[in-house]
Amino acid sequence: MPRKTTIRISSNALASNLRTIKNYANKSKVWSVIKSNAYGHTIKAALKGLKETSGFAVLELNEAVLLRENGWNGPILLLEGFFEESDLLEICQYKITTVIHNDWQLNYIKQYDIKSPIDVYLKLNSGMNRLGFNEKDFIRTWYDLSNLKKISSLTLMSHFSLGFSTKTVNKQMNIIRKIFKILNPTLCLANSTAIIFHTYTHKDWIRPGIILYGILPKENKKISKKFNLKPVMTLESRIISIQNIKSKEYIGYGKNYYSNKSNLIGIVSCGYADGYPFSVPFSGTPVFVNGTRTQIIGSVCMDMLTIDLNDCPNAKIGSKVELWGNNISINEISKLANTTSYELMCRISSRVLVKIE
């Protein structure tokens, strides 16, 4: 019998979030970003919940092939492009749109005998300073590619480094506008934060990532109420032991939690080997048990953690414990753990059960 530590993935929540995004950016097509196994939610869940997307954006070629093998016939974007010249065979075979962000990729394209023309997203480094061509080299490369019969279409792609900052976005947009006046390209610019905070960046295509999964990239009560995004992932486990602890006792490894009163505690079968963050405080991190919000006490262990049951009189062996989801925000946990919700979702262990609903 497997351990009960489980992530539940709501395909209905995924579909709802996509509808919300499409309604908000209703003049743009949508690349649903499902890199890193759909931010830990699984490609299978993405296919089920995001059927109405315009296309899927992935990182690795094997994710793109998996989409095709599971029946997706629409557009697929390879966000970092190809890594080897040999990758171009599958890009052509599976009709995948590739990013080009560097001269070495450009040279591979020129050298490779491409039988069927491919779609290319040319990456502009407008200020992120990670991937892409600078302004001058971008224009040169654009003209270079546009003269190749093996290229069927070109799109300008860029990425905002601080999507909620008007100053930063405008600085990058000024560079993009200069190039737009020269080339008049199709544009793909806005990531999740820019989609929400800067509607003028929406253009032809948008690339929502974290917001598809019900998480705002920056906490904002007004925005949260406006969008009403639904959490897609719930991490839950079960109580496997209940202990009555006398006053003036330590709980768990390292004597990190001292109780000066009698305590009813529950041992939950989830730990850092499952992906729950070890770095949360020794008290105060919320969990949800039988309709009651309570807290973790003591250190998170490899396979278990301890919770306070003093205010949960109905808790028993086998009671469900929500660690994040509809009742406990993953953003709240990530702040307490001094990390991000992105990291928490992506680092769920392979030993955790996945249930797609």
From Swiss-Prot:
Coiled-coil region: none
Protein name: Alanine racemase
Cofactor: pyridoxal 5'-phosphate
Superkingdom of origin: Bacteria
GO CC terms of this entry: cytosol
Catalytic activity: L-alanine = D-alanine
Keyword Thylakoid (UniProt): no
Pathway per the UniProt entry: Amino-acid biosynthesis; D-alanine biosynthesis; D-alanine from L-alanine: step 1/1
GO BP annotations listed: D-alanine biosynthetic process
Enzyme class, broadest EC rank: isomerase
NCBIfam families given in the database record: alr
Encoding gene, per UniProt annotation: alr
SUPFAM superfamilies xrefs: Alanine racemase C-terminal domain-like, PLP-binding barrel
